[in-house]
Design a protein with these regions (language model features):
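Phosphate/Mg2+-binding loops and adjacent switch elements
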Residues: 1-31
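Catalytic core of IPPT-family isopentenyl/dimethylallyl transferases
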Residues: 27-150
Length: 150
């Protein structure tokens, strides 16, 4: 529903229909798109570690700070991945273990949706298996590509 509301806002503010706003011409710039893949079990382990780190580094305190500054749970920013679960923990609706479990589950669902959304057969995406490539190597690929543009 947020996307529909935003689309309507744009149409009203520009006076153009959505189809009129879509450009049909090819952009006058080149695009390099990376697709990063990883064994699902490795990715899930990294997700688990990241969630634990976020809590260890003050995620709960961050949310309390946002609430103190006037943020409310009906704001779009407070519906970002994990924030509703942190909110439920803060409101004593469930314990920390359950909050982490739910955030892990939601994160895994997002991974599955992203793997479905981005096709491995899409030739406009340069796919890299992260088990065999470091971020430094990816950076080198990007720099080489940029340097090859006339």
């Amino acid at each position: 529903t947020r996307r529909v509301i935003r689309a309507l806002e744009v149409c009203i503010s520009t006076g153009k229909t959505f189809s009129e706003q879509r450009t049909k011409t090819k952009p006058n710039y080149d695009i390099l798109t990376f697709g990063l893949t990883m064994e699902r079990s490795d990715l899930y382990a990294r997700i688990d570690e990241r969630i634990d780190n976020m809590f260890d580094n003050g995620w709960i305190e961050e949310v309390y700070g946002l609430l103190d500054k006037g943020y409310t749970w009906d704001m779009p920013s407070m519906s970002a991945l994990g924030y509703p679960e942190v909110g439920s923990f803060i409101r004593d609706e469930f314990d920390l273990m359950e909050a982490k479990r739910r955030i892990r589950r939601i994160s895994r669902k997002l991974v599955r949706r992203q793997y479905s959304w981005f096709s491995m057969n899409d030739t406009s995406i340069n796919w890299y298996e992260m088990k065999y490539m470091s971020l430094a190597e990816l950076y080198s690929v990007a720099v080489s590509w940029m340097n090859s543009i006339p």
